[in-house]
């Protein structure tokens, strides 16, 4: 009887171990979404190709480079799309997406664009929160994430920092709040939006209104 019980226990344990080993075993391997830890003082990211390369480089550094990474950015003229407009939402696949802590971000595009900003969800590729207006955040505020997009992830024309190639004071870019907070943790209006809260001051300097030239990266 003891031998039979021991064998049964071994079978149960083996099944459980197999089930548990199906998930990511280290930070980064299951990551399909992050905010960039790398920053930019201007809105010139080298266009979509430069932004995509930044996403891939950061993902590779944490062991998640074996995926197709795309920056969540809208542009008015996309060379890869016949110089037609491209919406950020059309670049990132259909989900689901998980952050670097293994936490589900959204199951699909509709769920993603129904979200509000959240400092515990919208983290960088190392799982670290982005400085913002959340309680206990270090300074300076850097929660303005460049998107060039409306709340539904489509192009906001005229707000793309010259399709992410401009560092001019004459161009602007639309940004979202990664933590979902405005000044004094205000969540009214668009301030809670993760992808379309307001425009930056201009594309020559991403800092004055609470940014650091960060972007969102998604694996397709």
Please give the residue ranges for each predicted region:
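Secreted/extracellular ectodomain signature
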Residues: 18-220
């Amino acid at each position: 009887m003891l031998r039979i019980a021991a064998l049964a226990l071994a079978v149960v344990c083996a099944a459980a171990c197999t089930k548990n080993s199906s998930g990511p075993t280290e930070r980064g391997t299951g990551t399909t979404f992050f905010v960039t830890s790398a920053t930019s003082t201007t809105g010139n990211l080298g266009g979509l190709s430069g932004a995509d390369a930044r996403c891939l480089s950061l993902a590779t550094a944490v062991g998640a480079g074996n995926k197709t990474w795309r920056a969540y950015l809208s542009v008015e003229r996309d060379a890869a799309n016949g110089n037609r407009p491209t919406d950020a939402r059309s670049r990132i696949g259909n989900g689901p997406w998980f952050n670097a802590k293994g936490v589900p971000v959204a199951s699909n595009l509709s769920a993603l664009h129904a979200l509000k900003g959240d400092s515990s969800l919208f983290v960088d590729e190392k799982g670290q929160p982005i400085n913002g207006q959340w309680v206990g955040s270090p300074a300076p505020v850097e929660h303005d994430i460049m998107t060039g997009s409306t709340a539904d992830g489509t192009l906001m024309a005229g707000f793309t920092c010259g399709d992410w190639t401009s560092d001019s004071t004459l161009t602007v870019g639309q940004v979202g709040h990664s933590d979902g907070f405005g000044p004094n943790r205000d969540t009214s209006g668009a301030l809670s939006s993760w992808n379309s809260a307001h425009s930056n001051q201009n594309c020559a300097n991403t800092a004055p209104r609470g940014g650091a030239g960060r972007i969102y990266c998604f694996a397709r």
